Structure formats: C-alpha cells, structure tokens
C-alpha cells in the first residue's frame, strides 16, 4: 500500500450540487430556488415556528411547569452495578470510585434491575422496595 494508491471507498463520496451552471445542468438560472420571494433571496427564510405573522402556536398556549435541576444530579443504580464496587459497603463515594456514577451526581437510588450475587451493605442511598427485597434475600442490609 502506498500513499498514491489510497482512495475513498466506493460510494463514500457524493458529487456536490453544482448550482447555476446553465440550463442543461437542471440547476441553472434560479439554482433550484424558484422565482423571487423571501426564500429565493440570500439569507432569506423564516425562523422556526413562524406562521406568517399569525400568533404562533407556542405563544398561543400557556406556560406551565418547570424542570427540576435536581434531576441533573440524581442517578439510578442497577443491582448488577453493585458488583463493580470493591468491598461490600456501598456508598455514593464508593460508586463514584468504581466509575458507576460520575463525579457530579449527588443523589442515587438503587433500583431492581439485574441481580445481586453477594451480601452488600447500602449506606446513604435510596433503595426501591423491590431492590430492598433482593438485597436482603442475598444476605445484605440497608442502612440510612
């Protein structure tokens, strides 16, 4: 293999649209923009949601609710992720050390997904009812 023999894979490159290159090209004269009008002009076009001056739908409907910022720092932990932690005591810090959670997470809840094989102690984490039953069935415990 030499540099001068390298080429893109078959079908990987497409020919660019060549606009305004005569009638025979199929994209001559108006270059596929039609005749006159706002959309035919350079920089022409209307913003998303614009309805020609009519009050747009997103302004006709009332505002409601908000997005809780707590959701950005909260995570779910699956039961099978608990096996990735060294030792049998599981806290927020041990989950971060095992790369189960990212460093910006401040709240976590263990959910019933997968299975837990070893007896573990959960400290300072939320636990769902199903996950609690599964952890205690494996010989583990939950501490607040």
Curated annotation (Swiss-Prot):
GO cellular component annotations of the record: cytosolic large ribosomal subunit
Pfam families: Ribosomal_L27A (PF00828)
Keyword Zinc carried by entry: no
Keywords: Ribonucleoprotein, Ribosomal protein, RNA-binding, rRNA-binding
Organism domain of life: Bacteria
Chain spans, region Disordered: 1-53
PROSITE patterns (alphabetical): RIBOSOMAL_L15
Span of the signal peptide: none
A GO biological process held by the record: translation
Gly residues composition-biased segments: 21-31
HAMAP family associated with the record: Ribosomal_uL15 (MF_01341)
Subunit-structure text: Part of the 50S ribosomal subunit.
Record's function text: Binds to the 23S rRNA.
Protein family (similarity comment): Belongs to the universal ribosomal protein uL15 family.
Official protein name in the record: Large ribosomal subunit protein uL15
């Amino acid at each position: 293999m030499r540099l001068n023999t390298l080429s893109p894979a078959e079908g990987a490159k497409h020919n660019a649209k060549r606009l305004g290159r005569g009638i025979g090209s199929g994209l001559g004269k108006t270059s596929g923009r039609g005749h006159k009008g706002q959309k035919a002009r350079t920089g022409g076009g209307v913003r998303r949601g614009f309805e020609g001056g009519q009050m747009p739908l997103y302004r006709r409907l009332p505002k409601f609710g908000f997005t809780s910022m707590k959701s950005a720092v909260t995570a779910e932990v699956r039961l099978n992720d608990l096996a990735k932690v060294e030792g049998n005591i599981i806290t927020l810090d041990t989950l971060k050390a095992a790369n189960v959670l990212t460093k910006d997470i401040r709240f976590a809840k263990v959910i019933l997904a997968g299975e837990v094989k070893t007896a573990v102690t959960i400290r300072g984490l939320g636990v769902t009812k199903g996950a609690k039953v599964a952890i205690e069935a494996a010989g583990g415990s939950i501490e607040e």
